[in-house]
Design a protein with these regions (language model features):
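Short catalytic/metal-binding and nucleic-acid-binding patches
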Residues: 1-152
Length: 152
């Protein structure tokens, strides 16, 4: 598969630090639109809220799009890989239970940006929250049910 041969090189430079803020994007494995079913998207939301409540990662903004997740958060405990593994595996189990499927839900890996302290978190949050608008899914952000932002 193209791109797989050097995927370890992307991970080798990844740095996890408690207190660091990350913007992460992760996609569905099938390329499908599983989260167009908002009930299934809520299962991902439940996991984001759980890691927040357990002080593992403090969510600043997120949006569950039909085929991917954007998440801005502060890492509190563990590593970036472990937090993403937890959210993805627990949500995949819940989604497979809800649908009766047994297959893979998420792609392996994710894209991440370590946000510098001098960058505007609100600009990252605006970018995330406006994704459904830019994708033409809704006319106003209020019409899309699968997002949240600390500042709104």
């Amino acid at each position: 598969m193209p791109g797989k041969a050097h995927s370890h090189a992307l991970r080798s430079g990844r740095f996890s630090a408690p207190g660091q803020i990350y913007m992460v994007t992760t996609r569905l494995s099938s390329g499908g639109r599983t989260f167009a079913n908002w009930r299934l998207g809520r299962l991902v939301v439940n996991e984001l809220r759980l890691v927040h409540e357990q002080d593992i990662a403090h969510s600043l903004a997120w949006v569950v799009m039909p085929d991917h997740l954007h998440w801005l958060f502060e890492l509190r405990l563990g590593t970036l890989d472990r937090v993403l593994q937890r959210v993805k595996s627990r949500s995949a189990i819940a989604i497979n239970r809800a649908t009766g499927d047994t297959g893979r839900v998420w792609q392996t890996g994710y894209q991440d940006i370590a946000v510098r302290h001098d960058e505007s978190l609100k600009n990252f949050a605006r970018y995330i929250v406006a994704k459904p608008l830019r994708a033409g899914l809704v006319r106003t952000v209020r019409d899309y049910p699968l997002w949240d932002c600390k500042w709104l």
